[in-house]
Amino acid sequence: MKEEVQKKSSGAGKDAEIVKKKNEYLNTLFAAMKIETKVTIDYDEENCNMVFDLEGPEMGILIGKRGQTLDSLQYLVSLFVNIESESYIRVKLDTENYRARRKDTLENLAKNIAYKVKRNRKSITLESMNPYERRIIHSALQNDKYVATRSEGEEPYRKVVVYLKK
């Protein structure tokens, strides 16, 4: 695994050490998965953000079905990064610009579903989504005059319902 670190903050702190320690963790993780990966880290110490951009020939495997594998890896990396951190660091793991593409897809889905709800005058329940994806749907339709959204169900099966406003 290759690693590049870009640091936006010039301050040195204990959090900066985490950037170095994560290298061993990710090496072990990707070696176990038998995936060759180049990792670029964008670490903004001032805003407590760490973005891991992954590149390699088999990134589809890391993304998984609807990003579930990528979300799981992000969770594991976040746990590892924050174990020794003085302050909480927000971790984002991305590859092939997947997160932005998924956001665009969900925003388009929200608009299409809103159109169908208006046309058919019936509520539509979407498939189960993680909290981040549900938030994208809610945000995409929050300013619509004719439809509203709500989440129903229990995790991990919570779904967004798009319905006509009364």
Q: What is each residue range found by the language model?
A:
Residues 1-166:
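RNA-contacting regions in translation and RNA-metabolism proteins
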